[in-house]
Amino acid sequence: PIAGSMVLAAILLKLGGYGIIRMVQILPTTKTDLFIPFIVLALWGATLANLTCLQQTDLKSLIAYSSISHMGLVVAAVIIQSPWGLSGAMALMIAHGFTSSALFCLANTTYERTHTRILILTRGFHNILPMATTWWLLTNLMNIATPPTMNFTSELLIVSTLFNWCPTTIIMLGLSMLITTTYSLHMFLSTQMGSPMLNYQTEPSHSREHLLMILHIIPLLMISMKPELVI
């Protein structure tokens, strides 16, 4: 069910991040060198989750692994225990909560019309539902953290934190962000471009679907314009 996926990605996964933030506060702040293995594992896990996204043929699986990769960055930033790291982690959890929920919503919009989640079978939607293509583009741009969105602000804070802590981490961070951009564009092009593979009668997009997307994107853009509300 799509509602379960949206709640899981937007709220429950972030509750785990909140739990990590509360737990880290009781750890010694001066001994961050002890946490090197955990930070390396978090960054490596984010990179592996991104690589797994590139291999997915199922749309919902791709979005789910995308959420996991972003949580790897959150964990790495939280463990360092700097003010910028905590602010970036909080901002990324909020921003990605909106983004991943919107992506699941769009995936369901596609599934209701094609009755399949296989990427190659859902192509050609820019000719059929041009407004939905606009939502896909906006949401994917947010997913790859383009400015001036909240995703960009949060990832910039996390990158600054990790680079100040250890400049070598920029290698894994850069690789992770490059792969994120690759699979996001792959997802957009696979679902929207080309000619439709299946011969089916497609009903037009409904007002409720546009309203759902507006309720995801407008709050995120408003928070992006005034990030001090959450940072």
Swiss-Prot record:
The chain crosses the membrane at residues 1-21, 34-54, 61-80, 84-106, 118-138, 156-176, 211-231. The keyword Membrane applies. Its EC number is 7.1.1.2. GO terms for molecular function: NADH dehydrogenase (ubiquinone) activity; ubiquinone binding. InterPro entries: NADH_UbQ_OxRdtase, ND/Mrp_TM. Keywords: Electron transport, Membrane, Mitochondrion, NAD, Respiratory chain, Translocase, Transmembrane, Transmembrane helix, Transport, Ubiquinone. It is found in: Mitochondrion membrane. It is a multi-pass membrane protein. GO terms for cellular component: mitochondrial membrane. It comes from the Eukaryota. It holds the Pfam family Proton_antipo_M. The keyword Methyltransferase does not apply. It catalyses: a ubiquinone + NADH + 5 H(+)(in) = a ubiquinol + NAD(+) + 4 H(+)(out). One of its GO terms (biological process) is electron transport coupled proton transport. Its main location: mitochondrion. Core subunit of the mitochondrial membrane respiratory chain NADH dehydrogenase (Complex I) that is believed to belong to the minimal assembly required for catalysis. Complex I functions in the transfer of electrons from NADH to the respiratory chain. The immediate electron acceptor for the enzyme is believed to be ubiquinone. PANTHER family: NADH-UBIQUINONE OXIDOREDUCTASE CHAIN 4 (PTHR43507:SF20). Belongs to the complex I subunit 4 family. This is NADH-ubiquinone oxidoreductase chain 4. It comes from Hypnale hypnale (Merrem's hump-nosed viper).
